[in-house]
From Swiss-Prot:
Positions of Zn(2+) 2 binding: E146, H180, H234
Positions contributing to Zn(2+) 1 binding: H60, H62, E146, D313
Pfam families: Amidohydro_1 (PF01979)
Protein's name according to its UniProt entry: Dihydroorotase
Organism: Methanosarcina mazei (strain ATCC BAA-159 / DSM 3647 / Goe1 / Go1 / JCM 11833 / OCM 88)
Key word Metal-binding present: yes
GO cellular component, one term: cytoplasm
Amino acid sequence: MPDIHIKNTRIYYNNSLQPAEIIIEHGKITKIGKDFRVSSSDMVIDAKGSLTLPAGIDVHVHFREPGMTLKENWYTGSCAAAAGGIATVIDQPNTIPPTTDRRSFEQKLELARKKSIVDFGINGGVTGNIEKLKELWRLGVTAFGEIFMAESTGGLNIKEEDFEEALAEIKRLGALATIHAEDEKMRLELEQLLKGDVSCDYHSKVRPNACEASAVQCALEIISRLGVKAHFCHLSTLEAVGMIRKEKYLAKRENKEPLFTCEVTPHHLFLSTRDWERLGVFGKMNPPLRGSHSIKALVNGLNDGTIDMVASDHAPHLESEKGPDIRAAPSGVPGVETLMPLMLAAVRKNILPLAKMIMLTSWNPARAFGLDLLGKGKLEVSYDADLMIVDPRNLQPVRADMLHSKAGWTPFEGIDAVFPEYTLSRGEVIWMEESINAKPGRGKFLEGKGKMSEED
């Protein structure tokens, strides 16, 4: 007896949309085909012609727990993910306490296991704790980072002299380093130079394109020298995309796999410096909003394969915390619930093809972070039934009052999006009919490769 029978749907297969039915048993996709004769099942979903796609994998969220639960917690953050078609997330380490040793890791893991409704990984923090990285790797962290090369929320930025040593240890462990690339020296110099600037786009001026480009160049040199596997978080500039494209081309020319992957966020794709006046403090994030030339470069990078994936960098703050002062306002915007809907709208608007969007939001993240080994990332037989059912014709404006994050606001207010009708996680419907359909704690911890190898 199947657990779920999805009928009257369409899937992307062999480079085209095709009618299909899907049978799900024990949390896995067991059959994909047409005209199945099923005598009974626990649940039949009539998709009525809507698409069934792999659910999103968001490799960059800040669910703020422990320590900052006024902003978000594992339950509210995971509900936002589910409502947006995300079935797997990877949480970042800049909580209170930061996830930098056994005690803090186990504290976060216990909270996530009690509250999350989606599957999750946990990254380990990297500052001056290089002697703790092996322990964290054996405990099951997904990756290390984001390693902050410049100041950001949580105070986890690494000293310049420790950065290469940390990457060397991550290489020795066979782990993955995820990097927040901004040049701290340049940022501090510009902060002093612009201390009298009160313009709304101050934040983009104090962290300009060159700030990211300098840090990316530095990191690429160390990555190449050490041979460490790395991932660049939230690339945002024309210059950085050009560097990444060149390095990937050189690797391909030598028939080598690049040592690194990279992500871009929806806020760097769909918002720009033109939005500073409208958004004010609600447009402040690190790295900051960019100009139209960078946005065009990011879109081109998505389409030509330079950029590997899209991630939300969901970093919520309450409206009251943002305050009126652009300098004092904390950096970060909510985004996990709007990631997939905005990307689906981009497909509808011919910004990128559906096949590319699927790769960017499911398979590429799964492969880069080792989640493919755990059955994540594809709508295929034997993979986890992590799925979203969506009608691509159903464009609607994003509204803060329809979202589930504790933040209570969104920088994407009024922008067209396509929200899912259903979200499934391991064969369980966790979002349907515009409501959460899951209990806290059903989410599964996805152990990292260090834990898996220890058990082999």
